[in-house]
Structures are given as C-alpha cells and as structure tokens.
C-alpha cells in the first residue's frame, strides 16, 4: 500500500476500529463518568519588584565580588525593580568578564534571596589583522587583551598599528561598573599629512605624539561612560620641506572631562542606535621657550553626535553634527585644533572630523560647526550603497565662523561590503573646495 492510496488507508483504519468498537465504547463511557473538567483561570502575575533579603554569588573566581556588585547595583535588605535587575545583568555581561550571567530567587522570610550565578570568560585574547585605507595606507594590526591583571576586575589592552603611520597604546583599566574605576593609558602616534593652501599642497607635516592619561571612570548603564582626568603630552611637529619649521618636542598638560555613549547595533553599517561624545579640556603649554610665545593656554569644548533612523528593513537615514569652540583660540597647539577632511576617523587627535570631498586634513581651525547626513541602503545581503552630504563652517575666529569664505559643502557616494575581515568600502566624493572627484578606499577594521 502506498501513501497516496488515501481511500484504501481510510477504509483499513475504519475496519480496524470497528473490530474493537466495544472496547473503545467502554473507554469513552469511563471517561465521561468522571464529569467535565473544572476550569481554572491562570491569573498569576509576575511582580514588578521584589524585596531582597540577601544575595548569593556563585561562580566567581578571578573577578571580584565588588566589581559584580558595582555592575548589578543591587543591595540586600532593599526592594529592587526587576527591570533594573535585568539592566544590571546586561551591564555585567557586556563587561566581557563573563560568558553568562544568570539569576534566580529562593524564598526567604520577608522576601527572597537573590542568587547570581556566573560563568567567567577567557582571561586573555590575542588578535592580528591587516588594514588599508587611502589616508593611512597599509597597517598590520596587533591586539592583546588580558583580564584580572594584578587586581580583580581589571583589563589590560595592548594595541598596535604598524605601518607608514604607526600607532600603539597600552591601556590598563580597573572597571567597577557603576562605581568609580581607575584607568591609565599610554599612546604613541606618528602621522604625516599634506598642508593645503587654495587647493594645492603647500607643505608636508610630520607629527610625533607621546601621551599619558590618568583618569577615573564611571559606567552609566552599559553604554555610557563618564571620565574625569589628566593628560600629559610630549608632542613634536615639523616640516618635511622647510628646515626652519622644526619645533622639536614640547610638553603639554591637559585636565579634561568627557562623556561617551554608544548604542549602535553594530560597528559597521549600523542601522539603529546613537553615538555621542562630549569633551571639555584645558590645554596648558609647559615648555618655557619659543612655544610660550607661539602657543597659548586654551579651553576647548567639543561635542559630536550621530543618530540612526531606521526607515525600513533595508534603509537607514543617518544624521549627525560636530560642534567645537575654543577660548584663547589664536594660538591653540596643532594637535588640539579641529582638523577636517578624509574619511578615516582613526586618529589620536580629539578634533578630527571626516568630511566628504575634502582631502585628508585639508582644513583646520579652532571654531567649527558641521552637519552630516547619509542614506544607507542594503541593496543585497551584505552589500550597501550610501549617498552622503556634509555641510558646515570652520574658522580661526568666532566672528568669521559663518562667513561664506569658511563654508564647506561636500557630497559623495559610498559602496560597501560587510565582510568577515571588516568593512570594505569605496567612496567617490566632491566638494566646493575641489573641482575634481576624490576617491577613498577602506579595507578591514581600523585600530
């Protein structure tokens, strides 16, 4: 008999059932004699809060209990909203110290015991990669991350980008979640770039920077970080063309406050979320020679925000702005000015602003307002096309900020592919400062 012989199958089943009909009838009568089942409404509700009498931690080995408490923000002998508890669990998991973070409740007199069970992650990660873009050229990327070095709850990051423009950093952080933590970071960075005047190359500038940062950090939720600290810089700038333009190494001292928040859904071709960075710093020149006449102490304020507006499953409208202002701005040190142009944001300078249609660091000043708009469309699987437009002003005097001569307008079209080695992008651009089209290529993640 085949599965397609429907009539034969039905007939055979009916004959088999009739052969044992008396037994089936007795079974049905027996069930019916029990009467109808009583209906019970399921009206139990999950409470929005619970009283925590005590807390138990299971699975902690290398991570301190203080760190986990700082992430969770739960205290015994107090009420806790379950939404707040879930936020704390997400915050702890996002730290990277744990492979899993789970919780449960045990009944207790007057409330419940909160049981936090964790599985700690690997203590170290090593990585290597390669990156190329039109601004920085090719670089070999090296990365190492170690956890719980010297102190529990600490992280040590070692990064290097070895190439034509070398960058390296060593970063040690004692992260205590929503409790104040402590960090120290050393960065070395050298960069060569053209200096432009009226669209033509005027000079080739070389810079070398050594910087040490000491700061205290507070993590708000799992996406926002507040920092207050000090920077010491040992910075050199010179000309590759003019032998008279070589100022040697000079020292700077900079207290700062910064706030950073990142809720992007992914690092490349993001479709939801917001990223914002704010920094207020006071730059003090420490060297007592020609520099005290050339550069003056400067108070620098800057804020940058980029927002994703999902329009449909495949398209996202992106909007952003950068605003930067400087007091005592006539002679601000080079590395603390606002520099505009190019597409790669991977620089040690706080005030770097990518801009369509301008060549790498083509414009610089100490007062600026810039807006950025783009429409990202996912044309097929991991392929994207993104038209972009940027507009804004940059000047050396606040009175000149909105004059026509300081207005910049750039536009471009980017073609991208989200590959396993990182974003691969080709962008063609133009602007009111360059009559010819400018191309930009990016391959892989940047450091």
Task: Identify the function of each model-found stretch.
Residues 23-31, 268, 314-319, 383:
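Flexible, glycine/charged-enriched surface loops at secondary-structure junctions
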Residues 83, 88, 94, 100-102, ...:
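Gram-negative/organellar outer-membrane beta-barrel architecture
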Residues 128-132, 142, 158-162, 184-190, ...:
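Transmembrane beta-barrel strands of outer-membrane/channel proteins
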Residues 374-407:
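C-terminal hydrophobic structural anchor segments
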């Amino acid at each position: 008999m085949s599965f397609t012989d429907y009539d034969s199958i039905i007939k055979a089943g009916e004959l088999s059932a009739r052969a044992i009909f008396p037994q089936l009838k007795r079974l049905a009568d027996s069930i019916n004699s029990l009467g109808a089942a009583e209906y019970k409404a399921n009206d139990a509700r999950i409470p929005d809060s619970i009283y925590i009498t005590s807390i138990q931690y299971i699975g902690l080995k290398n991570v301190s209990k203080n760190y986990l408490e700082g992430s969770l923000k739960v205290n015994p002998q107090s009420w806790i909203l379950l939404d707040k508890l879930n936020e704390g669990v997400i915050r702890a998991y996002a730290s990277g110290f744990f492979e899993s973070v789970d919780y449960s409740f045990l009944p207790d007199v007057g409330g419940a015991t909160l049981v936090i069970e964790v599985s700690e992650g690997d203590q170290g990660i090593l990585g290597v990669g390669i990156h190329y873009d039109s601004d920085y050229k090719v670089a070999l990327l090296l990365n190492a991350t170690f956890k719980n070095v010297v102190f529990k709850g600490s992280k040590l990051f070692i990064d290097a980008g070895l190439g034509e423009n070398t960058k390296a950093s060593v970063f040690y952080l004692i992260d205590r979640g929503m409790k104040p933590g402590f960090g120290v970071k050393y960065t070395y960075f050298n960069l060569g770039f053209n200096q432009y005047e009226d669209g033509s190359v005027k000079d080739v500038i070389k810079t070398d920077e050594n910087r040490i940062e000491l700061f205290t950090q507070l993590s708000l939720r799992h996406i926002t970080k507040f920092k207050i600290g000090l920077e010491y810089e040992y910075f050199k700038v010179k000309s590759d063309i003019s032998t008279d333009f070589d100022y040697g190494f000079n020292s700077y001292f900079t207290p700062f406050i910064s706030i950073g928040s990142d809720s992007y859904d992914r690092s490349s071709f993001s479709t939801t979320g917001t990223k914002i960075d704010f920094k207020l710093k006071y730059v003090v020149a420490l060297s007592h020679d020609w520099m005290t006449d050339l550069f003056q102490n400067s108070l620098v304020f800057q804020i940058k925000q980029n927002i994703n507006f999902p329009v449909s499953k495949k398209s996202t409208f992106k909007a952003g702005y950068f605003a930067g202002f400087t007091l005592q701005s006539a002679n601000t040190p080079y590395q603390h000015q606002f520099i505009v142009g190019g597409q790669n944001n991977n620089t040690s300078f706080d005030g770097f602003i990518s801009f369509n249609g301008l060549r790498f660091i083509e414009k610089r000043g100490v007062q600026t307002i810039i807006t950025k708009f783009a429409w990202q469309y996912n044309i097929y699987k991991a392929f994207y096309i993104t038209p972009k437009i940027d507009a804004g002003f940059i000047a050396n005097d606040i009175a000149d900020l909105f004059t026509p001569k300081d207005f910049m307008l750039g536009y471009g079209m980017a073609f991208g592919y989200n590959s396993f080695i990182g974003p691969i992008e080709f962008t063609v651009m133009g602007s009111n400062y360059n009559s010819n089209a400018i191309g930009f290529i990016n391959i892989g993640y940047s450091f």
